[in-house]
Structures are given as C-alpha cells and as structure tokens.
C-alpha cells in the first residue's frame, strides 16, 4: 500500500506505471510507462507531478512540475492523458498557480470542469471578422493604435517603461462590461506580484479577473506551463459565451524558462540558444485568440515582451511581432522625459485597428498623426536657434497641447467618447488659444450624458473650448519655444 491515496487509486485502476531511473534538475527519466501519450500528466508516489515530454521505447522524459527533487527509484503512474487544469466561472476573482491551485488564502476552488492546457486553435472556418474596439481607457492607445476585440497585439518595452501600468489600466477599464480578464504573471518577483494584485484590488478590477502566477521561486516547468494554463481558463469562459482578455506578462520570462529546460534536456540550441520550436511554442499559444463565428464572442491576447535597452530587433521581439496583429511599444527614453504613457508612436501599429473605428474616429486618428508629424518637423527646426515661422509655431503649439491632453496618471481612465471630446476640442483650438487641459478633462469626465451623434460632439466641443481657453498672444507664436520636454520619437 502507498501513503498517497490518489496514487494508490490510480495503480489499482491499472493505469500505466513506471520507475524513476535518473533526474537532472527539472528533467526526469522514467523507465516503463510504455505507450504513454505525449503531454500526459504523471503522478509520483511522493505526490509530485510531471509532464510527459518525450518517449524513447521503454524510457520516457518528463518535466517535473513541482520544485522538490525526485530521487531515483520513485514510482510513477499516469494520472491523465492530458495535462489539465480547473476552468470555469468559479475561478473569477481568484489568484491561482498554473495548476489551478489557489494562492489567495480564500479557500479551495470548487470548479466543476477541467480542460487540457495544450488545446488547438480554432480553424479558419470557425472564426469571424474582428470589428469591435477594446477600450483601454488610455487615449494614447485607443485613439492612435486601437485594440480590437479578438486581436493579438504585442506590448513591448524595457523594464519600468510603463507596460504594467498600462495593462492594469486596461484591466480596470473593463469594469461595467461582461468581459473577463485573465492575467498571467510569469517568472515575476514577489514585489511585482504584490504590486499588481494591489492595483487590481484598489481599482476593483479583481472582481472580473483571474490571476495566474508563476513567480521566480516556482519551478521552471510552472513558468513554462503558466501561459498555456491561463489560455485554457480563458478558452473555457470564451466558449461559454464571454468576451475574454488575456495578458501574458511576460513571454520573455516564458521563453527563458523554456530555454533553460531545453538546455538541461540537451536539446540542440538555435538562435540566441532558444530551442528550435520556440516560434511554434508562442505561435500555437497566440493563435488560440480570435472571434468565434456564431456567438461573436472574442478572446483578445496581449503578449508582453521585455526589450532591454529598447532593442526591438532581438529574436524574441521580432518573433512575437511576426505572430501578432500589431504592437504597442513603450519607450524608456520617452518615459524618462516624464511623458506618461511613454508610447512610441513611430514604431507602434495596430494592423486591424481601423476595422473597429467609425468614420469620425478614423478622421480624428488621421488628423492626430498629421499634427504630430508637423510638430516633430517644427521641433527639429527649432533646434537651429532661429525664430519659427507662424505656421511652424502653430504646429508646435498644437503638438504641445496634444501631448498635454495625452498625459495621464495611472488612476485616470477615459471612455472612447471622452477621449474623442478631449482631443477634438484640442484640435478645434488649432493652436490659436491657450487651453486649460486639466479643467477641460474635468469637464469632460463630468459630462455624464452619453454623447453619440456628430451634432452633440460638435456642440460640446465648441462649448468646452469657449469655457477653457483664452487667445494666444500672436507675438508669442513666432518666437522660439523654450519647452521641448514633450518631444517623443
């Protein structure tokens, strides 16, 4: 008889059994388990678990899911043909590990369903066109690089460039909708985990969020499994009729964990020592997002990639960008200038964003890009030390006002209508008036009525401009501007 009751039950049920013959860190070699399926979940007699990775005749290679060392001679039994995790609504509002075990001291999770974590992506005939915007509450993203429900859009940037702040804002902005957020934290420090959980709790976002955590003290295998487990939880809710947003923070740590496991396993390394199937590991994960034909429900994926020194040309960065439908890049140099959010407008793009915008929003986005381009040209001229022409000075003024309007603290969130009112009011002034941006924002947020048609927009914008502006001295427009702190790339 075995001390582990679950192990005893599986053995008595005549499940395949084997014996550990060698271990190397998180790699376990088992003799027996003949005919076992790749991806099966294995239970060891000491209660630890493993994932079947490779099979060579009567020898099987497993990843150790847990952190404790397994000694040769330990018996193993197949627990399930697929590695499965609990899924369903019971996980909403909870913090779990990649195996679905609770980490929040709120008691056990009574999930009624389980799902395999390596599910195939929906086929092309099961998908529908993307056409509805996912509002993040951040004008620098929503008005320039709209995220569409069902899209896969990468979030790139160096450490401490504002990525996590933006993702927390996006999560909080889903309050009041039926959308559920799955936030996978991979290989993170305890302080980063606590900061995120604190932000989600304080904003109320935790009520519609599932947080999956594999921190730096967990096993490499848990870090490798975390995004797939989170995706399985998201897919279950998606197929049950919910719009779901999943955040993978971050796939750089996931790739690092997979690289270490592969090197320990003595897999031949490829570029940057990553295994040869690194691209497949991420593409098979991200392809699981989309919009379902019939229900029109969506799974939106936001993979995060850390770009040291703002280098977006690395293997991992370019690999993720080639899989996704766009990228939002946070620039550390812009962040250091005090601009929040520090989005690099020149390198960011949303390839399907236009499909979710109406005609007025498209005109606004186009005008904003034109005004920002004119601002940068005028700024370059100002470096020569001579006075600016009236047109260039106006371009400078408009650009500075746009940047002031885009400046945003972590606690600020704006609906799409509020963002349009804010930026269209600034453009309406055309640099000919001084605008009190702070007072303008307060008035727009205080406007509780739902502004829908063009006449209402035009009326409110003219009214806001009249209330919160005063004429600019014409003599000031042709002098060299002294404030260049708002420049960006």
Task: List PLM regions with ranges.
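Residue-level signature of catalytic and energy-coupling elements of molecular machines
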Residues: 20, 73, 95, 147, ...
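Acidic-enriched and Gly/Ser
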Residues: 2-136
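Flexible beta-alpha connector loops of hexameric P-loop NTPases
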Residues: 129-134, 156-159, 182-186, 209-226, ...
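Conserved nucleotide-binding/hydrolysis micro-motifs of P-loop NTPases
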Residues: 35, 67-69, 82-83, 100-102, ...
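Conserved catalytic/coupling modules of large nucleotide/cofactor-utilizing molecular machines
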Residues: 253, 267-489
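Active-site phosphate-binding and catalytic loops of NTP-dependent enzymes
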Residues: 83-87, 101-108, 125-128, 239-242, ...
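Conserved P-loop NTPase nucleotide-binding/switch module
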Residues: 162-166, 170, 176-180, 185-186, ...
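P-loop NTPase nucleotide-binding/switch module
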Residues: 76-77, 103-151, 164-170, 206-218, ...
């Amino acid at each position: 008889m075995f001390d582990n009751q679950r192990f005893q039950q599986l053995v008595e049920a005549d499940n395949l059994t084997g014996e550990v013959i060698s271990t190397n860190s998180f790699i376990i070699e088992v003799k027996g388990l003949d005919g076992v399926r790749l991806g099966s979940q294995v239970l060891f007699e000491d209660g630890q678990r493993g994932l079947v990775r490779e099979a060579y005749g009567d020898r099987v290679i497993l990843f150790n899911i847990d952190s404790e060392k397994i000694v040769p001679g330990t018996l193993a039994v197949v627990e399930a043909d697929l590695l499965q995790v609990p899924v369903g609504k019971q996980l909403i509002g909870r913090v779990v590990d990649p195996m679905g075990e609770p980490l929040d001291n709120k008691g056990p999770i009574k999930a009624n369903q389980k799902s395999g974590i390596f599910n195939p992506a929906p086929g092309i005939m099961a998908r529908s066109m993307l056409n509805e915007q996912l509002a993040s509450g951040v004008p620098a993203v929503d008005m320039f690089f709209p995220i569409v429900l069902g899209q896969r859009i990468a979030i790139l940037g160096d450490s401490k460039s504002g990525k996590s702040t933006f993702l927390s804002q996006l999560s909080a902005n889903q309050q009041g909708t039926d959308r559920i957020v799955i936030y996978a934290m991979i290989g993170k420090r305890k302080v980063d985990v606590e900061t995120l959980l604190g932000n989600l709790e304080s904003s109320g976002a935790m009520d519609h969020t599932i947080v999956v955590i594999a921190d730096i003290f967990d096993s490499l295998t848990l870090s490798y499994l975390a995004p797939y487990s989170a995706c399985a939880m998201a897919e279950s809710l998606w197929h049950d009729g919910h719009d779901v947003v999943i955040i993978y923070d971050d796939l750089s740590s996931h790739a690092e964990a997979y690289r270490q496991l592969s090197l320990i396993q003595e897999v031949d390394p490829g570029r940057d020592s990553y295994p040869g199937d690194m691209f497949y590991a991420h593409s098979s994960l991200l392809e699981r997002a989309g919009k379902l034909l019939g229900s029109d429900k969506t799974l939106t994926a936001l993979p995060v990639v850390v770009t040291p020194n703002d280098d977006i040309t690395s293997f991992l960065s370019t690999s993720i960008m080639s899989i996704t439908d766009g990228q939002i890049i946070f620039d550390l140099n812009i962040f250091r200038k005090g601009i929040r959010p520090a989005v690099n407008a020149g390198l960011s793009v949303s390839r399907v964003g236009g499909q979710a915008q109406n005609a007025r929003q498209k005109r606004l986005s186009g005008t904003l890009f034109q005004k920002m381009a004119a601002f940068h040209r005028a700024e370059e001229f100002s470096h020569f030390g001579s006075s600016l022409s009236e047109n260039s000075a106006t371009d400078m003024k408009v650009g500075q006002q746009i940047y002031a309007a885009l400046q945003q603290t972590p606690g600020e969130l704006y609906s799409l209508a509020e963002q349009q009112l804010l930026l269209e009011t600034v453009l309406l002034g055309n640099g000919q008036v001084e605008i009190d941006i702070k007072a303008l924002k307060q008035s727009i947020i205080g406007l509780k009525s739902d502004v829908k048609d063009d006449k209402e927009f035009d009326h409110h914008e003219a009214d806001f401009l009249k209330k919160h502006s005063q004429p600019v001295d014409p003599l000031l427009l042709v002098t060299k501007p002294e404030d260049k702190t708002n420049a960006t790339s």
